[in-house]
Design a protein with these regions (language model features):
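Mid-length scaffold segments of soluble, non-membrane domains
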Residues: 124-174
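Helix-rich interaction surfaces within compact, conserved domain-sized segments
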Residues: 168-249
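Juxtamembrane cytosolic interface motif at the C-terminal end of transmembrane helices
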Residues: 46-54
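Hydrophobic membrane-insertion alpha-helices, especially the h-region
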Residues: 34-47
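Terminal targeting segments of Actinobacterial cell-envelope proteins
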Residues: 1-28
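Extracytoplasmic low-complexity, Pro/Thr/Ser/Ala/Gly-rich segments
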Residues: 54-135
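N-terminal Sec-pathway targeting helices
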Residues: 25-37
Length: 249
């Protein structure tokens, strides 16, 4: 082997060693990057879990501090009525387009025929100036919502408390953004004397196919004053998952 050949072979070995070293360094860098990414993902998961856990726990403490105590709210016991009317749409776009108002069996309604469209919006608190139609909100009840109705003569003065309750309740697992506060329309019937606030929910047990309704009921509770503790107890007793159409928006 000539000196030139030896030199070329040596250069080739050196070049190969350099390539191997660079490949090794590249593998190390990739392993470090992968490790950092994995660590960041774990940290993100931990932070997300902690945030969700804190979100779940915080409303439980806060809700009971809003408004008056349960004892001071002067609430009647929850009334449970046999329910019907699921899937019965009236008004525009239905087979009964001239029906613009439903005469409900209870005040406030907790079940019954309703307009074809529920209220689908990020807003959860309404005033007299922009209140949805009762018939739209009954459709929301069918989808698992709880509605807190308020007498406008008393509710307007307590809008700050109502907003705080709505914000906190919508973070509960029992509600998860299915809680609406809206003024009551006395044209649909007057609240009993001394009652200014009312909760209603349309519950149901689904059949094995998760589409048919095996049984259903309407639930109402009327109060003289607003109590976060009462609201929390009601929505946890009648959660969003108990409804004729719990998967509706």
């Amino acid at each position: 082997m000539t000196k030139k050949q030896v030199s070329q072979e040596r250069k080739a070995r050196v070049a190969q060693m350099q390539r191997q070293e660079k490949a090794r360094e590249r593998r190390i860098r990739l392993q470090i990057i992968a490790g950092c990414v994995a660590l960041l993902l774990v940290l993100a998961a931990v932070i997300t879990y902690a945030a969700i856990d804190a979100r779940k726990k915080q409303p439980d403490v806060a809700i009971s501090t809003f408004g008056v105590s349960a004892a001071a709210a002067a609430c009647s016991p929850v009334t449970t009525d046999p329910a019907k009317g699921n899937g019965v749409h009236v008004g525009h776009g239905t087979s009964t387009p001239t029906t613009t108002k439903v005469k409900y069996a209870t005040v406030p309604p907790s079940y019954g025929p309703h307009f074809a469209q529920p209220i689908v919006a990020d807003r959860k608190v309404y005033t007299a100036a922009d209140k949805p139609a009762i018939e739209n909100l009954v459709h929301n009840l069918e989808h698992g919502y709880t509605v807190l109705w308020y007498d406008q003569s008393a509710g307007e003065a307590k809008m700050d408390v109502l907003r705080k309750i709505a914000d906190a309740v919508n973070k509960l697992d029992a509600s998860k953004d299915k809680f609406i506060v809206s003024p009551w329309d006395p044209a649909y019937g007057a609240f009993p004397a001394g009652k200014k606030f009312a909760l209603s929910h349309w519950s149901a047990t689904l059949g094995a196919d998760k589409a048919s309704v095996a049984s259903q009921a309407g639930h109402r509770q009327l109060c003289g004053d607003i109590s976060g503790a009462v609201v929390k107890s009601f929505v946890e007793s009648y959660p969003r998952t108990s409804a004729p159409e719990p998967f509706g928006a």
